UniProtKB/Swiss-Prot annotation:
This is DNA protection during starvation protein. It is an enzyme of class 1 (oxidoreductase). The gene is dps. During stationary phase, binds the chromosome non-specifically, forming a highly ordered and stable dps-DNA co-crystal within which chromosomal DNA is condensed and protected from diverse damages. It protects DNA from oxidative damage by sequestering intracellular Fe(2+) ion and storing it in the form of Fe(3+) oxyhydroxide mineral, which can be released after reduction. One hydrogen peroxide oxidizes two Fe(2+) ions, which prevents hydroxyl radical production by the Fenton reaction. Gene3D superfamilies: 1.20.1260.10. It comes from Yersinia pestis. It is found in: Cytoplasm. It catalyses: 2 Fe(2+) + H2O2 + 2 H(+) = 2 Fe(3+) + 2 H2O. Homododecamer. The 12 subunits form a hollow sphere into which the mineral iron core of up to 500 Fe(3+) can be deposited. Belongs to the Dps family. One of its GO terms (molecular function) is DNA binding. Its EC number is 1.16.-.-.
Length: 167
């Protein structure tokens, strides 16, 4: 005969995982991770839009620079999405979710000069860079904070590179 007690627990909105981070920390962290997934997906698509459609002085240098940014953004968003799942959540990365939840302004499709694209990109990179710095201090999960810190370093560098090319 078992001496184990039955303990009633409240239903969880999370998927089962043996990860022992407290549930309330997981829930808040997953929410913030998904906010970053959304912003990084949108920023990566915006970056590619500019990459494809710019013309003018410094085209080759900026075109190639943006390719590197896109690769790094995709790597970071993949890390965020996987961390959300590791904590028992669901990564939210569909076009519908991105369109509905992004804080970024719609990217203009009627601009063509390198300078116009750089200005539009700088505005959007700054929004994400500033928000991820807030996320670093908001999350209680240290691993996620470390991921945000790594991404923040890249975003600050990318914003600096973009702004340094604006005439």
């Amino acid at each position: 005969m078992s001496t184990a007690k039955l303990v009633k627990t409240k239903p969880s909105e999370l998927l089962y995982t043996r990860n022992d981070v407290e549930e309330h920390v997981k829930v808040a962290t997953i929410k913030r991770l998904n906010q970053m997934v959304i912003q990084f997906i949108d920023l990566s698509l915006i970056t590619k839009q500019a990459h494809w459609n710019m013309r003018g002085a410094n085209f080759v240098a900026v075109h190639e620079m943006l390719d590197g940014f896109r690769t790094a953004l995709t790597d970071h968003l993949d890390t965020f999405a996987e961390r959300a799942v590791q904590l028992g959540g669901v990564a939210l990365g569909t076009a519908q979710v991105i369109n509905d939840k992004t804080p970024l302004k719609s990217y203009p499709t009627n601009i063509h000069s390198v300078q116009e694209h750089l200005k539009a990109l700088a505005e959007r990179y700054a929004i994400v860079a500033n928000d991820i710095r807030k996320a670093i201090t908001e999350v209680e999960d240290e691993n996620s904070a470390d991921m945000f810190t790594a991404a923040s370093r890249d975003l600050d560098k990318f914003l600096w590179f973009i702004e340094s090319n604006i005439e």
